[in-house]
């Protein structure tokens, strides 16, 4: 019985790792609203503290300067929901705790203790500047690396098309914080 469960779990995890490459949508500069499905892994290694890691799945919808991000465990159990609008940001946990702030970056810092660039993420996901970033293109003209305010974003593509959207992002700051995103599906939202 135990062997069967282990085998079933292994097969399920391997099946979850197989995914189709992200779709090629219209040119990234024209994309305003989008949604994506994928996985994340976050590692925080602060001086004088043991490194902390977490990971799971995410579902992100960006529409008209508002975002809704659902985070779940690798097995699909809800962990948190983050909603941001230009006026208010709200974070709800699976335990029912709720926090609000007028600034999403401040909200995440209050809840996690880490200043994460939440407001810049929609632009960074598409390989655009969230402000005054330096963007270095790959050999076929797509964003390959972005540098902004101490953050570095490295982009990887599964599709060779020049208009392809990234399938992997590695977002890091000073070796202290590393967020890896594996985007399994991009959709343009009308």
Swiss-Prot record:
Gene Ontology BP terms: lipoprotein localization to outer membrane; protein transport
Keyword presence, Protein biosynthesis: no
Chief place of localization: membrane
Membrane topology: Lipid-anchor
Chain residues carrying a lipid of type S-diacylglycerol cysteine: 17
A Pfam family annotated for this UniProt entry: LolB
Gene Ontology CC terms: cell outer membrane
PROSITE patterns tied to this protein: PROKAR_LIPOPROTEIN
Listed InterPro entries: LolA/LolB/LppX, OM_lipoprot_LolB
Record keywords: Cell outer membrane, Chaperone, Lipoprotein, Membrane, Palmitate, Protein transport, Signal, Transport
Signal peptide: 1-16
Subcellular localization: Cell outer membrane
Lipidation (N-palmitoyl cysteine): 17
Keyword Lipoprotein: yes
Family note: Belongs to the LolB family.
Function: Plays a critical role in the incorporation of lipoproteins in the outer membrane after they are released by the LolA protein.
Self-association state and partner proteins as the record states: Monomer.
Record-given protein name: Outer-membrane lipoprotein LolB
Gene name for this UniProt entry: lolB
